[in-house]
Structures are given as C-alpha cells and as structure tokens.
Amino acid sequence: MNILFILKQFPRYGGVEKMTITLSNSLVKIGYNVCILSLFKGNKCEYMSRLDSKVVCLNMPNEKLFSRENRRHFLLVLQENEIDVIINQNMDYEVNKLMLKLKGNVQGNGKYFPAFITVVHNDPFVDFKCLDTMIKGRGVKNVLKRMLKPIYQVYIHNVVRRSYIMASLVSDKMVVLSKSYVSSCAELSRCEYEKIIAIPNGFNVDDKVDGLFLNRKKLLYVGRLVETQKKISELINIWKYLCEEFLDWDLLIVGDGPDVGIYKSLVKSENIKNVYFEGSTNSPEYYFNQSTVVCLTSESEGFPMVLIEGMKYGCIPICYDSFSAVDDIIDDGVNGYVIPFNKQNEYICKLRYLMSLDDTSLCYMRNNAIKKSELYDMNKVVFEWEKLFNELI
C-alpha cells in the first residue's frame, strides 16, 4: 500500500513533523511505501537524520499554493506513486480548500482519488483556551483585540469552525489524538461521530534506557520556548519558590523559541538559582536519562509526547489538567501528578512532596511511569493505523 503525508512545511522542527517521521518509519518497516509532500519549502533540520532512507520526500514546485503548476504536480504525485491513502497533517483552511477542489475535479472526471485522512494534532478548542495569552502584550493589535474581545472571540470561533468544516468536507476520516476530543471535533466540524476516530501518538522503543535507579535530582522541560500555550514563565515562577529549599536540584529547560530571551531575563531579574537553558537538541533522551521529573505548565496541549517519552525513561510527569487527554497519559498519584489548572500553590506543594520522596518511593513511581508509557509503543499505534487503512481501501 502507498501512503502520502501532506505537510505545510517539511522538514522543520516541531511535534507534528517529528511524529510524521516516526509514523513513516514504522510504516516502511512493515512494508508500506511512504512519500512526504511539503507544500512550502522546509528548513534544514536534524530530525531528517532519523527519517528512513526509503521514505520519498517531495516538494510543491511553486510558492503560490493554488498555482496551476502545483495542481498539476500534486495530481502527478498521486499518479506516479500510485497513492492509496493521503494523510493530511494540518488543519489549514486554504490547504484543505485546495485538496477539496482537486478531489472534486478528479472524481468529477470519473477517476479514483485516494482515501483522505486529516489528523487534528491539538485540542480542538486550543484557540479558545489560549485566547487571553494570545492577546497579551503592548502592540496596537493586541490592545485593540483586548478592547474588542467579545467581537474577537466570535471572529476566532468562526475562523476555527470554518477550518474544521473544510477539513471534514475533504476527509473520509478525521483522526484525533484522544477519545476525549471526538465530541469537540464533531461540534466544530459539524460531522457525524462515526467520521472521527481516536489514534494516539506513539514512540519507538528501540532506544536503551539507562540509569533508572540513579540519583537524578533534575526537573526537566522539553519543548518550544513560547509563552502562548506553553506558559513556561509559570514553571520558572514555580521553581522560584523551591530552588532555595532544594539547592541540590536543577531545572533544565531544553528547546528554543521566540521567547527564550524573556525567560532568561526572568531568571536573572528574580535571581532564581539552578536554572539551565540547554538550547535545542535532536537527542532529548540524553536529558530524560538525567532527570527525575518532566514538567508542563501549558494552558492547553493536544497529546504531549514529551510526557510519554519522559515516562519511557523513568521520568515522573507533572502537569496541569488543562487538556482532557491528560487522563489518557497520567494516572494521578500512580505514575505522575495532575494539578488543577492555574492552581500554582498546589503545583508547588506536589513538586515539593515529589522531590522529598525517598529513593524507594521514587523508583516505584518511575517504574509505573515506564509501564504506562508502553501503551504508546509505536508498534501498537501503527496497528491502529493499519486497521483504519483497511477500512478505507
């Protein structure tokens, strides 16, 4: 069977791109032919070193998405590679509008168009949950958005709904990352529940896990350094209340992004001890192997693989209940901790408790975390994708 992934830009750093590589490699491993089509020119990215050499990477020839050259090229890609299934990895309205037009033209001429799957990689309501953070700042646009917030909320709702409806129109199936997202996806896209299926992200189990029982007194954040949605300043402020009490512990912040300067300034101005900015990395497992706790303070997430990858290495996850899929990942008090959203004091208290546990108790939770992560072994996840392919073909 021949599979085509569509991404807006590939390669580039990001969770969607990383998961595309992981799934592509797993499909190739079990005999599928895989192509990845980038609609716009990508950037150099270390992730590419992990992509199986059998995966064919393609690009649209023209930067103008709707150009005749691009339309012809896309249909040629389908024909030459005998594509059976398209996996669309974005919710962009214009992209899906183009796909719907091409699908209509092909089917209108009595020809076969591949099965079309769109993957929703976030909480469908993320734009509403993060609205207040999105309109913070001193810029004129943000000031106007705050002044006209009720109107802006309606505008955002209409933009998001329009994108979901367009995705639903072009898709034979829509994939969300958790069963808890099915109803919200159906509400926004106005489609039947039967059209939506939940398949989680997965990870490869090939890497060796070392040092489970070592004394690893480190808290870890891995991800984009951007305040909108991620709210890393919240984690830094939480650490501010603990760093003097736990001088033998460190907070490692791994990643890069537009707000890294803000976070470094916050650490410096507040004189917060033992915070280390490690920059971006293509080997987060190095940091997982060093750490005891993996932290998130996001105001919304989709299905954060950073928690599951950390659990694989024996890191105990702690995060806010700001996304419904958290219950798929963490069993509170068993293999990690889930804190009510925006309850910073509870987050601080739970971290203090966790950092004070004896080695036996820590190892018990770490082992539980490892066992839970095994549910998301890519070998199990790819089986769910195979079932979906067979249903559509």
Residue spans for each PLM region:
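Conserved acidic donor-binding segment of nucleotide-sugar-dependent glycosyltransferases
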Residues: 321, 331-333, 337-345, 353-359
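Aromatic "clamp/platform" in nucleotide-sugar-dependent glycosyltransferases that forms part
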Residues: 280, 299
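Short hydrophobic beta-strand element within catalytic cores of glycosyltransferases
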Residues: 316-320
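A short, well-ordered alpha-helix in the C-terminal region of glycosyltransferases
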Residues: 360-375, 384-387
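A conserved mid-protein helix/loop that constitutes part of the nucleotide-sugar donor-binding site
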Residues: 17-22, 217, 226-241, 258-264
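Membrane-proximal helix-turn-helix segments that form the acceptor-binding/catalytic region
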Residues: 140-174
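Short His-centered aromatic/hydrophobic patch
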Residues: 88-95, 120-123
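N-terminal strand-loop element at the rim of the active site
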Residues: 6-13, 19-20, 26-66, 181, ...
